[in-house]
Amino acid sequence: MTFALALALLQTVAIPGGDALTAEIKAAEADLFATFFQGCDPARLAKQVTPDLEMYHDREGVVTTSGEAFVALYAKQCEAKKAPDAWRSRRELLPETLHVDPVPGFGAIEEGEHVFYERKGDGPEKLVGRARFVQLWKKGPDGWRVARILSFDHKAVP
C-alpha cells in the first residue's frame, strides 16, 4: 500500500452538527434539485452524485445503480424538455418536514417531504403530487454528493 493511499484511508471527513449540518444539506439538496428539475447541465449533475449512486422509487422501482447511468438518463430527459410544448416539472421541499442526522466520518441522512408542480410548455403551473424521501449524502473534499435516494409514498394532489 502506498503512503498516499494509507493516508487517504486514515482521513475522515469533518461533519458539522446541528443547524450547520442542516444548512449545508439544505443548500446541497436545493442545488441538486434545481439542477435536476430546472436545469439541463449533465456535467453539473455528475458532480452532485457519487459514482455508486443508487436510487429507488416506489412507482418506478430501481431507477439507477450508478451515477453515470443516472446522468445519462437525465441527459436524455434534457433533450425532451427542449420541445416548446414539453412537460416541465418543479420540485419544492416542505421545509417543516426536513430532518438531517450526521453519519460520522461519511456524511448525513436527510429525510423529508416534497411537492411537485408541472406545466406544459409555457402554460400555467399546477401542483400535482406529494412524496416522502430519504437521501444519504457523502461529504468529500469537493463538497456534498448524494449517494443513495429513496423516493416513496407518492400521492396525487387533487
For every predicted segment, state its role.
Residues 29, 90-92, 110, 114, ...:
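Polar/charged side chains located within well-ordered beta-strands of beta-rich proteins
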Residues 51-54, 111-119, 152-153:
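Generic short beta-strand segments
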Residues 125-157:
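Short beta-strand edge/turn micro-motifs at domain boundaries
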Residues 98-108, 124, 137-143:
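A short, structured loop/turn motif at beta-sheet edges
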Residues 2-51, 68, 157-158:
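Short, low-complexity N-terminal intrinsically disordered segments enriched in polar/charged residues
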Residues 18, 42-106, 127-128:
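A solvent-exposed, acidic/Ser-Thr-rich amphipathic alpha-helical stretch
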Residues 97, 113, 130-134:
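Well-ordered beta-strand positions in beta-sheet-rich domains
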